[in-house]
Every structure is written in C-alpha cells, then in structure tokens.
Amino acid sequence: ALPICVKRGGAAALLFVVLTLAGLPLLAGGRGGLGLLSGPSVGFIIGFPIAAFVTGWMMERVQMNVLTSSFIAALTGGVIALYIPGVIGMALVLDKSLLAAFGLVSAFVIGDLVKVIICGFVTQAIYRAQPDKVLSRA
C-alpha cells in the first residue's frame, strides 16, 4: 500500500480478504473459506485491510523524504496495525493472554521488520525511477 493511495490499497486488501473468505485458496497452504474466521489467524485476516489502509494513510501524511516516510508507514501499518488485531484474535481463539499470544507470533516480527526495510528501499527506488508512480504526499 506504500506506492498507492489509501482507498486503492485498503480496497485491494479488502477484496483479497473477501475472496479468501469466499473460498479461494489464496493463503499459505492453499487455505481459504469461512473456517478461517474460527482459527487463530482470524485477527490477522481482519487486520489485513486495516493495515493496508493505515499504511497508505501514513504515507500520505508523513512529510519526510520518501525513504523515511516509507519506513514509518510500513512499520505503522504493516507491522503495528496488523499485529494488534492479529494478537488479539489469537489470544481470544486460543484462550491465551495477550502476552502469550504475542509470544506465539514473535518469531515473525524480525522478518516483518526486515520487510519494512526492504519496502522502504523499493519504494525509494520506484520514486527515483518514476516519481509519478509513488503516492503523492502533497
């Protein structure tokens, strides 16, 4: 959602969730269907369009250079805004504390932080090559 607008990023992520819940095998392992709503990843599924919206919203509002704006937007939307509903959903489904649920997903945090860094550099490269392809923050 970094190089595209809030509405398009959020809508694309929402469409992905709707198609997945409709049964298309779009998740890892070919998973899809309404049964996902009763599994431990329900919060991440619900949080996916929220994360895309927050990422685009942050990219529009953070008034710094593209690299820094991208890092902040990807961290805020792609990690924080995704992990909050994800951990809450996992805690509820598994009947665990929030801390215990976070412990279950903590192994993924480092990888997601690496993706934040990569995303920032990719967005910066796109901006340098084709500035009109990256979300305007003016």
State what each model feature region is.
Residues A11-L19, A73-T76:
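Central hydrophobic cores of alpha-helical transmembrane segments
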Residues A12-F16, L24, A51, T55, ...:
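Alpha-helical transmembrane segments and their lipid-water interface positions
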Residues V62-R137:
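Membrane-embedded alpha-helical hairpins and interfacial helices in multi-pass inner-membrane proteins
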Residues V17-A51:
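Interfacial aromatic-anchored transmembrane helix boundaries in multi-pass membrane proteins
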Residues G9-A13, L36, I45, S70-F71, ...:
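Alpha-helical transmembrane segments and their helix-entry boundary regions
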Residues G43-L75:
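Internal catalytic-core helix/loop-beta-alpha segment
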